[in-house]
Amino acid sequence: MDASTINSLFLIGALLVGASILVSSLSSRLGIPILVIILAVGMLAGVDGGGIIFNNYPTAYLVGNLALAVILLDGGLRTRVASFRVALWPALSLATVGVMITTALTGLVAAWLFDLSLIQGLLIGAIVGSTDAAAVFSLLGGKGLNERVTATLEIESGSNDPMAVFLTVTLIDMIASGQTGLHWSLLGHLLREFGIGGLLGLGGGWLMLQLVNRINLAGGLYPILVIAGGLAVFSLTNALHGSGFLAVYLCGLVLGNKPIRSRHGILHMLDGMAWLAQIGMFLVLGLLVTPHDLLPIALPALGLALWMILIARPLSVVAALLPFKAFHGREKAFISWVGLRGAVPIILAVFPLMAGLPDAQLFFNLAFFIVLVSLLVQGTSLPWMAKLLKVTVPPDPAPISRSALEVHITSEWELFVYRLGAEKWCIGAALRELKMPEGTRIAALFRGEQLLHPSGSTVLEVGDMLCVIGHEHNLPALGKLFSQAPQRGLDLRFFGDFVLEGDAELGAVAALYGLKLDGLDAKMPLAQFIRQKVGGAPVVGDQVEWHGTIWTVATMDGNKIQKVGVRFPEGTRPGPGLFL
């Protein structure tokens, strides 16, 4: 390869990445997921478009694995362990039982539609059996979903790859060796994948945490060290026949939930690297496919995709979540719909090609077609389905920027910046009138380009920018303090007519609103009653019905319900005798 060829590759790569970024701005306007647009750019530049011929499957496998490792590391860093209280076991059930059921149901129909053997059909089911972390993390961000749904989908997508990889590799070996039956030893291999992946992921994350916090480096080197460490954990786990995907996700989880030096620098760079990984991966996968090869299989492939989306995924979700009573029908329906397929199935479809199996090209084309349908149908309709199934909650207003104040190696102090618009309720109020959360301080106030020295008598005006020092756990309270009037109206419509304290006694609430206790303990706190009615760990937005009234969890403090909203039937007035 001469210098001219290398330069041409650089130019083509830069143009494709740049075009993907520029065209992605159409995503919000057209309502199409960014990943579909990037995939389309790759396809248009490929053999049936721009004429770029790319059929190097080992290179695609390399790029895909590298990209997924970075994406999962970033996803783990941003996942809060607190979300495990509501989603860990349901997500693991989906990642194991759910994947197996989806594989079986999809495989049976694939074998029938394409006249394949049962083992070949199951291989197709295994290839497309897992949801994709890149697609889930990308499309769920900023949608305002309740914590139970978001955490379940994110943990599932980060942990279901071991099952899909295990089933795919096992079925490929069976086809290559002519086996037709399953053996109990396969269960041991599966447990090894999860066990080694879990141990090395948690252990590697702990070692990386100690290293980052004990060594003095230039600020820009910490993110690179974390990425290098994550890739080392990923590759070492794969070398020991564990799940590298699970390991790198858990490594990020450990790093993201402990005090770590240069946290914001690490997160900021990982965000950019994760985007670059997604762009590069989907461009390569778009280049890899030959669009005209998809046309002959379009109708049966569409039928298989719809079967998986409308039948196989919902049945697997219902079965996997059957033991977990806290999930409402609406939440199960939404989780069923967000079985997003992305890069993982396409990468797994490369395995049969590299193994030289018969019909391997058909498997690859089918996987690509199903991913395309999943992203277009499920990804595009995600916001609409979230509203239809009522799994969203009003988001807390966020600061326009936040940055770390590294006064200590493990300091968690941050600087939050809020801009006061005309609709802010605190306009015209003096600073002393603001009930700031305990432990927070207003550090500066900007008016136009002028820096003011804030005092208790300083009156806030439209356009003022407040710089507040606090911790991450202060954000909900600060968000309420600097909330907008329209947002408060939305909160009232969502949470109900009144908001009560969670520690209010049930007897007092019943007397106030004229409700019958029906043998319930009058001393029981309202929060405890709601928790019992939910049937599991509650989250903001959970709703229960009692005597025709709707009770909604409004705020949480860890596992504790702080406030509960109550909505009365239309046309009624709350008060004694209402339900007597």
From Swiss-Prot:
It catalyses: K(+)(in) + H(+)(out) = K(+)(out) + H(+)(in). Pfam families: CorC_HlyC, Na_H_Exchanger, TrkA_C. Its main location: membrane. The chain crosses the membrane at residues 6-26, 34-54, 57-77, 86-106, 108-128, 162-182, 193-213, 217-237, 240-260, 269-289, 292-312, 334-354, 362-382. Signal peptide: none annotated. Gene3D superfamilies: 1.20.1530.20, 3.30.465.10, Regulator of K+ conductance, C-terminal domain. One of its GO terms (molecular function) is potassium:proton antiporter activity. InterPro entries: Cation/H_exchanger_TM (IPR006153), FAD-bd_PCMH-like_sf (IPR036318), FAD-bd_PCMH_sub2 (IPR016169), Na+/solute_symporter_sf (IPR038770), NhaP2 (IPR023729), RCK_C (IPR006037), RCK_C_sf (IPR036721), Transptr-assoc_dom (IPR005170). GO terms for biological process: cell volume homeostasis. This is K(+)/H(+) antiporter NhaP2. It comes from Pseudomonas putida (strain W619). The gene is nhaP2.
